Design a protein with these regions (language model features):
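Active-site and adjacent substrate-binding regions of carbohydrate-active enzymes
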Residues: 1-493
Length: 493
């Protein structure tokens, strides 16, 4: 059992940065070997190429005239020019790789090189909508949610059957995405077409991150689009319950990751998703609410945590280096990386990048690495790998109070990773801005029959403990504010 360590890359900006750094135009089929070596050193299992698909001219035009986006470009890239704006990679005109990124052949070559280095490739699947430039808007308008006439959330397209008004994609709590066209999952033909499209994507990668996956749930979709009725009877059942098995029948190891919110995560897991976003964990960590983190993790079913995607950053969120000081950043990073499930790291996170670039940009400002953040992730990733974290089953542990009237144990996160016979690793973090103490119970087979050496993989610290003591009381922990330790235990024979 492995727990994926995924690295998200902004493909368009990354290739542009690489080209500048190496003094020549680089595409997916000419990525330098040094990139693969660095990913191996970090221990990644999957690369997520965010934004690899084709956007159209209308999407780029809309991205260049939106006032809110223009303000963001001005703040981040003063003096930006039209070529710096590629349009939203989630306004997809075609699920093909543009020549500027290396084309389909470049993607195939890149995937082969990833496999040769032991990595797997994730790509985007945006099931809720397509870009306004997609040919289906003209050729297959019945696949989209439609309005009988002009509407604020719709746009006009000319089709062989005359003009139609198609709804823009949206989620029910925000304004429509005006560069998109909303697919209609009440229609059986739409579902079949999207399943077939997903099959073509699955033939070119090893997994997909499904954008806003909960919007397709029948209850959510019916509520969102009640004012745009479908003339046909709604198809029964959930789309994901049909599409995921269809893909896995052809590609059994294919990975499905859902961007999901609103408490819909477990429902999507039960419909077949391997992993779903854990936004509640992210929110509690960024809020600095250690007790809330512990409560969320311990009250969640173990299978839910192990089927969740844990992160401190992604392309939608602010940079963690700008949100947390170094000490809480380190404790939060260890929490995310030490949990069972999928662990997601974002390009720039490991070097302390602070600028959050809108996804419409194909260029971003250069940021020198922050040595302290680089060292933080170098140390954590190396120590976790040495301790076997990310391999095999893991167990969240409820800490016990160190003594009466000491509530500081409520801020501790404890994760036990059994290793080879007679070894285990305990990941510990104190998510409080003050020192804390607790006892860590250790549900380890034959614990009391051995004496143990516990070495902290983040320092030179080590301890001898007797098995009966650990069995009876647990491991005593006394950590400073935002302290963290990774104890690897072996028998002391």
């Amino acid at each position: 059992m492995t727990h994926p360590l995924v690295y998200e890359i902004n493909t368009r900006c990354w290739l542009r940065d690489l080209s500048i750094r190496h003094g020549r135009c680089l595409t997916l089929d000419t990525v330098p070997e040094t990139e693969f070596s660095e990913w191996q050193r970090r221990g990644f299992t999957h690369l997520w190429l965010m934004g690899v698909w084709t956007t159209g001219p209308r999407a780029r035009e809309l991205a260049q005239c939106d006032p809110a986006l223009i303000a963001a470009y001005d703040a981040l890239l003063p003096g930006w020019r039209a070529p710096d704006i590629g349009g939203s990679p989630y306004s997809i005109a075609a699920y093909t790789v543009p020549d500027a990124l290396g084309g389909e052949a470049g993607l195939q070559s890149f995937r082969q090189r990833l496999h040769a280095h032991g990595f797997r490739l994730l790509l985007d699947f945006v099931p809720n909508h397509l870009g306004v430039d997609h040919p289906w808007t003209r050729e297959q308008p019945d696949r989209f949610v439609q309005s009988p006439g002009p509407a604020a959330a719709a746009f006009r397209v000319t089709t062989p059957a005359g003009d139609r008004w198609l709804a823009h994609g949206k989620d029910p709590y925000f304004a429509p995405w005006t560069d998109t066209a909303q697919l209609d999952y009440r229609r059986a033909e739409t579902r079949a077409a999207l399943t077939a499209l997903l099959q073509t994507i699955a033939a070119r990668c090893d997994g997909v991150r499904c954008d806003m996956a909960m919007l397709l749930l029948q209850e959510v979709f019916a509520r969102t689009w009640a004012e745009f009725p479908c003339p046909d009877a709604a198809s029964p059942g959930e789309f994901w319950a049909e599409a995921i098995p269809a893909v896995k029948k052809q590609h059994p190891d294919f990975l499905f990751l859902a961007e999901a919110y609103w408490g819909r995560e477990r429902q999507l897991q039960l419909l077949g998703f391997d992993y779903t976003y854990d936004k509640q964990l992210y929110d509690e960590l960024l809020r600095g609410h250690g007790a809330g983190v512990q409560e969320h993790l311990l009250q969640s079913a173990p299978e839910y945590v192990a089927s969740s995607a844990h992160f401190l950053e992604n392309h939608d969120e602010l940079r963690v280096a700008g949100a947390l000081a170094l000490a809480p950043h380190r404790a939060a990073a260890l929490t995310v990386l030490g949990l069972p499930g999928l662990r997601l790291l974002h390009e720039g996170q490991l070097t302390g990048a602070r600028y959050h670039a809108p996804v419409q940009l194909t260029r971003r400002p250069a940021e020198p690495p922050v040595p302290e953040v680089v060292a933080l992730y170098d140390q954590l990733l190396a120590a976790l790998a040495r301790g076997g974290v990310g391999r095999g089953p893991a167990q969240l542990i409820a800490p016990r109070a160190a003594w009466p009237a000491n509530p500081t144990h409520r801020h501790f996160i404890l994760v036990l990773w059994p290793g080879a016979p007679d070894t285990f690793t305990l990941v510990t973090a104190n998510l409080a801005p003050h020192p804390g103490q607790c006892y860590a119970p250790l549900p380890v087979a034959d614990l009391a029959r051995r004496n143990w050496i516990l070495r902290d993989l983040l320092s030179e610290e080590w301890h001898h403990r007797t098995g009966p003591e650990l069995q009876t009381r647990g491991l005593y922990l006394d950590l400073p504010a935002y302290g963290a330790q990774i104890f690897h235990a072996e028998p002391d024979d």
